[in-house]
């Protein structure tokens, strides 16, 4: 059985991943910040393990003994709305948090790390995005 880790699980992509895990019989460790207003949306299910871990805590977070996973999905990001989108100190901190997540993935035994971006990296685009779409971010969140 595959075992995965998900950050940003209370967002749209994260919630869809949790549902997919349950349907496919994949065990998932959900890392969620303590003050998340949407933590209650995470389903209680035998395949879903829930642990509190803020982005700023990933650097020092230690897995339990014998805790090992295959794939780490990193969907968490701070400052995705309002004026925080242009707070470059916070957006740069997100880069550091992502590096911390990569290191945590290693401590958890993950052989694969998948990090998701957003449309903000492309700016305003007519039509569908694809791997050849030029990036023209319009705010710090997109950079």
Model segments located where?
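N-terminal Rossmann NAD(P)H-binding glycine-rich loop of SDR-like oxidoreductase domains
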Residues: 4-24
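SDR active-site strand-loop-helix element
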Residues: 7, 31, 72-78, 113-119
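Short beta-strand element of Class I
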Residues: 27-29
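N-terminal Rossmann-fold cofactor-binding loop
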Residues: 31-36, 55
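Rossmann-fold cofactor-recognition segment
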Residues: 44-58
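NAD(P)H-binding glycine-rich loop region in Rossmannoid oxidoreductase-like domains
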Residues: 55-93, 104
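Short-chain dehydrogenase/reductase
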Residues: 91, 138-143
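Conserved Rossmann-fold NAD(P)-dependent oxidoreductase catalytic core, especially the SDR/UDP-sugar
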Residues: 99-139
């Amino acid at each position: 059985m595959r075992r995965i880790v998900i950050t940003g699980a209370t967002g749209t992509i994260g919630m869809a991943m949790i549902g997919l895990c349950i349907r496919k019989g994949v065990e998932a460790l959900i890392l969620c910040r303590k003050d998340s207003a949407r933590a209650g949306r995470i389903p209680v299910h035998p395949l879903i393990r829930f642990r509190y871990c803020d982005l700023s805590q990933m650097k020092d977070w230690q897995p339990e003994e014998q805790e090992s996973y295959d794939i780490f999905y990193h969907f968490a990001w701070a400052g995705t709305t309002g004026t925080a989108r242009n707070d470059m100190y916070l957006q740069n901190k997100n880069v550091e948090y992502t590096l911390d997540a990569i290191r945590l993935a290693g401590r958890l035994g993950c052989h694969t790390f998948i990090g998701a971006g957003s449309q903000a990296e492309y700016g305003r685009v007519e039509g569908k995005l694809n791997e050849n779409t030029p990036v023209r971010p319009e705010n710090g969140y997109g950079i």
